[in-house]
Amino acid sequence: MLNWDKEYLKLCRKILEEGTVVENRTVNNTIKLPSYSFTLNVKEEFPILTTKKLFSRQAFLELLWIYQVQSNDVNWLQDRKVSIWDEWKIDDKGYWNAEQKVKNPDGTTSIGEVHKYFGEEYKGTIGEAYGFITNKYHGVDRVLDKIINHKEDRDNVLSIWYNNHLDKGVLRPCVWSHEVDITNGVLNMWVHQRSCDVPLGLPFNVTQFALLMNMYARVANCEVGTLSFSIKDAHIYENQVKQIKEQIERGKFLSIYEGYKNTDWLEGQLERYTIEYNKIYDTLSEEEKSNLKKGITPDVIREVMTIKNVILYTLNPPKPELYLNPDVTDFYKFNNDEECKDAKVLNYKDLGRLYIPVSK
């Protein structure tokens, strides 16, 4: 199992075992830890989850949208078949609509429709947030100047938290700043997050900032080192608990089967569980088969499918590495078309999709 998978599952277990249930603006309560931090060695291992499928193309394009293209236009993502921000897109009349908890006159709360008006000039965007901020305040240009001309400086910080813009964006920045340090030719990064949807957001965030630090390192002509995350309010929504428990279960089976070194025995077990999986699969309804492709696993087949996938993983373990086009040294010239051909994860393998709902 990869180091990032181990760290991630440790955090998930800690939230479920020690977290506090709290209400929030969405219709789903969260289980939260007030703070959490970790450090990953990106030089030794490119961090991408394998205990569930991570769509790196979409993750990379979102990162480029914010820091390279410096845009708040959701259409840019949609043109590249990235739907991450669809739920937060301001409509053609200038409204953003959501179902959230609202306070009643008597002080109680209920679920209601929220319609926030931003203005027609913001249609198709997320308002004054993320890429809007990086563009307006030229934060990336400052980072690039520092890593090229002032490597020794201790103030290489990029923040996208500006109080005068917070109410003009649909969503306030979750990852709100990062810092860069170069020492002895090694670039390290610290990422600060005020709120973290651990099942959905964190897997993307870690892989994205691992890409960003590699892009910075390319520009600065240095190596990558460690990536550190500091999180306030690390949480799991209550409607995500079942899926996270399934992912934790995958990790448990993986820990068990990785201990077996007898390849012949593992291949025999693979044949056994494949036959059993096929038998159960044939009994599923068409709806269940369709859901399975989306990452919604019927209980009747979950354990057998997990063990089969774990054995396949164990027989040929993944060794993910980042391919970053070696011919590109200009931060703004890395390809950001739909294919995202200048940045790819090689040698990646996962234990299958998990459908995890969004709360907004």
Where are these regions (language model features)?
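Terminal, non-catalytic protein-protein interaction segments that mediate quaternary/complex assembly
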Residues: 1-360
